[in-house]
Each structure stands twice: as structure tokens, then as C-alpha cells.
Design a protein with these regions (language model features):
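Alpha-helical transition-metal enzyme core signature, strongest for iron centers
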Residues: 145-153, 174-192, 223-234, 256-267, ...
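All-alpha helical catalytic cores of prenyl diphosphate-utilizing isoprenoid enzymes
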Residues: 191-206, 215-239
Length: 364
């Protein structure tokens, strides 16, 4: 017969002991279990699908009821039982139309699955020496896009804290966007400092300031952040990808485009939801765009992106003055065509009222 180890004997003895003979620990209150059974809905068994157990799969029963107005001003998870007496928190965005997009849960899952690591996944050893003017142009664009990513991160962080917990799908997705932005800042800085160049000059930041100062509401910020600036950045990244000088740049721009596409999908979907669920929202968007188009026109005319992109497209300063600038102007035209099409989709016709400086890009 095998002999029990000392530890096994101790466990057995403890298990066989009568719990009534155990002395209570001095100063520790007897635990209460009156919280057990307090629930809005019990017995839920959500099963994983072919893609696993996804965030959107959990919207069943009471847990899937998403009200148009979230009355609770605490951090109570949606579907949990509320507790009386909890002091309110300053959640100023409590209407669904102020932040909602039906795609938020799916975009969250996609963002988690497609995260990438600049430190080890970018093929940095593919970088080769470029002509000085081209390297300077690439580094200037990295500087500019890094500022844009920082602006996106800051405005999201500002509004995310004001969004009610009842719409957690949006809050969770936007958390991934801030991480995307941080990753973009990281990889752009690494590209600028890894091939004999350096960071360029800070931009005037007219549109950045416009985005950061859009304090009327999250929807208003999204108009500037995604409908206007984001649509333009998509065209920039597409142009950079088509003109990448090496595998490292191809990896960077293609992965930034994937991330950016998620951001825009949420932004466009949210604006559509607001336009169809909030009376007068399209009129507000129209006013915002009238103001924003002026800042965008100034930045397109005077910003350093214009000449830097022309140099990249033209393979240098000489080529930038001709074919490079021609290609950049085509990029701006394509951006404006995208922008006007999106405005029509939202029910905001900007064809006739487009800012004259922007309209000139369509007439050339």
C-alpha cells in the first residue's frame, strides 16, 4: 500500500474536517451571498460560430437590447442589474445617434485579428539609399502623416471618455483605433529615422486644429476627421503605396491603408446613422462642411504635402515639377470625387456649393 505524501495527507485532513469546527478569522465579517440571484437574465449560453465567439454574438435577450437613449450615467455594463445610489458620471453622449454604427462590433473583431508589429514585421532590411530629394520628401510625408495620426488619437480619446457605457461596442472599437494611430506614429517615425534621413518640418496644421477644436459633439468631429480629412488620407496612402521604393514602404503603406479603411468604415457608417436618426443632422453637417472646405482648400494649396508628394511621384525635384505634380493634382481630383460621392450618399449635395478653390481641382 502506497504511503501518502505529507502534502496529500494535509489536504485530505483539511477536506475531511468539519467546517463547523473551524474558528472564524478575527476581524473578518461573515460573507454574505445576498447578491446571488440578482440578475436581469440568467441561463444564457451563447455558442461560438465558425469564427469563434465574437462580440456581436453576445447580443442576445436583454443583453442585445440597445436603447436609443441610455439613461444610466454610471459604468454599469449593458444588461447588468443597476445598483441604487451610485453617483452619476459626466457622460455627455447618451443618445445612440451620437456615436452608433452597426458595424462597430465586427470592426472591433477585425482590428484585433489584423494587428501588426512594426518592430519585427516590417522588412526594414529592404531599405536602400534613395536620392536625397526623394528621401527628404518621404521623410516629410512621414512627419505629416504622423501629425494626422496623433490628431486622430487625441480627438478620439477626448470624446471616448464622454460616451455612455451602454454603447460599449463603439467604445471598444475606438480603443483599437487609438492603438492603430499609435502604431502609425511609431512606424512613420521609424521609417523617417532608418534610412539616412530624419523628421521634416511641422505643418501649419489648419485641418488638425479644426478637428481638435470641433467640440460640438462626436458626430461633428467625425465629419472633419473621416469624411473630409480621412477620405483625403486614403488617397495619399494609395498613392504612396503605388510609388513605394522598397518592401518596407510597401508593407507600411498597405497595412496603414487596411487600418485606415476600418476607421473610415466606422466614420461613414456613423454619419449615415446620424443622418437617418437625428432630425436636422444633415443641415448641421452641411454647415460644418462649408466651414471645413475653406481650411482644407488652404492646406491643399499651401501645405508641404503638395510638393513632397510631387517629388515622390516624379522621382525627384525635376520630375516633380512636371509629371509628379500632374499626378498629385489627379490624386486631389480623385479625393474630391470621392468626397462629393460620399456627401450625396449622406444626403448632403455639395456639387453646387463646393468651395471655389476645391472646385478648381475638378475643372482642370
Amino acid at each position: 500500500m502506497s504511503e501518502k505524501l505529507p502534502t496529500e495527507a494535509a489536504v485530505t485532513a483539511a477536506g475531511e474536517a468539519d467546517s463547523k469546527t473551524i474558528e472564524p478569522v478575527h476581524g473578518v465579517h461573515k460573507p454574505k451571498y445576498d447578491w446571488m440571484g440578482l440578475t436581469n437574465e440568467w441561463g444564457v449560453r451563447v455558442k461560438p460560430g465558425i469564427h469563434g465567439l465574437r462580440l456581436g454574438d453576445l447580443n442576445v435577450g436583454i443583453y442585445g437590447e440597445i436603447p436609443e437613449f441610455w439613461e444610466d450615467q454610471t459604468r454599469r455594463p449593458r444588461g447588468a442589474l443597476s445598483r441604487p445610489g451610485i453617483p452619476p458620471l459626466p457622460y455627455s453622449l447618451r443618445y445612440k445617434h451620437e456615436m452608433w454604427a452597426d458595424c462597430a462590433a465586427d470592426l472591433y473583431e477585425e482590428a484585433i485579428q489584423r494587428r501588426w508589429i512594426p518592430a519585427t514585421e516590417v522588412p526594414w532590411d529592404s531599405l536602400e539609399v534613395l536620392p536625397d530629394d526623394v528621401e527628404r520628401a518621404v521623410c516629410q510625408i512621414c512627419t505629416e502623416l504622423s501629425q494626422c495620426a496623433n490628431t486622430e488619437l487625441e480627438i478620439i480619446a477626448y470624446w471616448q471618455d464622454r460616451m455612455s457605457y451602454g454603447y460599449f461596442e463603439v467604445k471598444q472599437f475606438l480603443a483599437t483605433v487609438t492603438f492603430d494611430c499609435a502604431r502609425h506614429m511609431e512606424v512613420l517615425r521609424k521609417r523617417a529615422l532608418s534610412n539616412g534621413g530624419g523628421l521634416g518640418i511641422e505643418s501649419r496644421g489648419r485641418v488638425n486644429r479644426m478637428i481638435l477644436e470641433s467640440s460640438g459633439g462626436w458626430t461633428e468631429a467625425v465629419v472633419y476627421l473621416y469624411l473630409m480629412r480621412g477620405t483625403y488620407i486614403t488617397r495619399l496612402l494609395t498613392g504612396l503605396l503605388s510609388s513605394a521604393h522598397n518592401d518596407a514602404e510597401s508593407f507600411i503603406y498597405s497595412h496603414m491603408l487596411e487600418d485606415h479603411a476600418r476607421h473610415l468604415t466606422y466614420g461613414y457608417d456613423h454619419l449615415k446613422y446620424a443622418a437617418t436618426h437625428r432630425k436636422g443632422s444633415t443641415a448641421i453637417m452641411r454647415t460644418l462642411l462649408t466651414i471645413g472646405e475653406g481650411h482644407m482648400a488652404d492646406e491643399l494649396k499651401d501645405g508641404v504635402v503638395r510638393s513632397a508628394m510631387a517629388i515622390i511621384f516624379g522621382g525627384g525635384i525635376e520630375g516633380g515639377r512636371t509629371r509628379g505634380m500632374k499626378r498629385y493634382l489627379l490624386l486631389v481630383r480623385e479625393f474630391l470625387e470621392d468626397y462629393l460621392a460620399l456627401c450625396r450618399w449622406l444626403g448632403i449635395d455639395r456639387e453646387e456649393t463646393l468651395h471655389p478653390m476645391l472646385k478648381s481641382y475638378l475643372e482642370d
